[in-house]
């Protein structure tokens, strides 16, 4: 039997412990409001939280039927530029700590000209101040990591995938808009009000 590698960014297990175990009771209460867990899953109740439809397991739940657990990573990604090949597919990693999550990373598949920006650049502005009470994200660092993504992978990327959003094609022609959006995100989320 062959083991499947489970990859995670540096610091992932520490962040899982601090964010999900220690803060979970407060998070669970706030998440019930943030994700409208008390509403029925129908046209007059809950439809979407912006990420997409909610799974319907048994009753009004946010996960499919079954159990949830954590399998610890078998390999920790320690630096940007680290390359690993799994089943003949090369994966190049960019660490992006403190962005959408305290331990986060993007993945570039050079042979497929595909960049996965994780949850760092979805179709919506993602969780700078999570309502459930998670750590406030650093908008400036987030914008800098997106700019680094553009510098590292922009000229080599034809396909862009993110979580919670449609894939995008013909990206080499679309990157001209990207820096403007990153700057706008940084400016609008960090300047003082008033």
Where are these regions (language model features)?
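Acidic, His- and aromatic-enriched active-site or binding-groove loops in soluble protein domains
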Residues: 2-16, 106, 183-193
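Active-site HxH/HxHxD metal-binding segment of metal-dependent hydrolases
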Residues: 1-73, 77-79
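Divalent-metal (often Zn2+) His-rich catalytic cores of metallo-beta-lactamase-fold enzymes
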Residues: 114-115, 124, 140-194
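Catalytic core of the metallo-beta-lactamase
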Residues: 18, 56-127, 132-140
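Short, surface-exposed, polar/charged, turn-prone segments marking secondary-structure boundaries
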Residues: 7-11, 33-37, 44, 120, ...
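Short secondary-structure boundary/capping segments
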Residues: 2-4, 20-27, 131-133, 174-183
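Active-site neighborhood of phospho(di)ester-bond hydrolases with catalytic His/Asp-centered motifs
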Residues: 1, 7-10, 96, 116-118, ...
């Amino acid at each position: 039997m062959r083991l499947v590698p489970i990859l995670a960014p540096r610091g992932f297990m520490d962040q899982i412990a601090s964010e999900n175990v220690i803060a979970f009771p407060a998070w669970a209460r706030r998440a019930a409001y943030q994700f409208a867990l008390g509403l029925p899953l129908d046209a007059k109740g809950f439809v979407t939280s912006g990420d997409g439809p909610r799974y319907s397991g048994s009753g009004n739940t946010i996960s499919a039927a079954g159990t949830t657990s954590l399998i610890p990573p078998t390999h920790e990604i320690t630096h940007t530029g680290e390359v690993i090949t799994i089943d003949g597919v090369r994966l190049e990693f960019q660490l992006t700590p403190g962005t959408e999550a305290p331990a986060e990373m993007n993945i570039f598949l050079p042979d497929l000209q595909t960049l996965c920006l994780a949850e760092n650049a979805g179709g919506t502005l993602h969780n700078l101040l999570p309502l459930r009470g998670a750590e406030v994200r650093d908008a400036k660092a987030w914008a800098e990591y997106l700019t680094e993504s553009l510098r590292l992978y922009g000229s080599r990327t034809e396909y862009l995938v993110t979580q919670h959003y449609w894939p995008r094609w013909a990206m080499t022609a679309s990157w001209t808009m990207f820096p403007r959006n990153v700057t706008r995100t940084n400016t609008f989320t960090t300047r003082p009000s008033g």
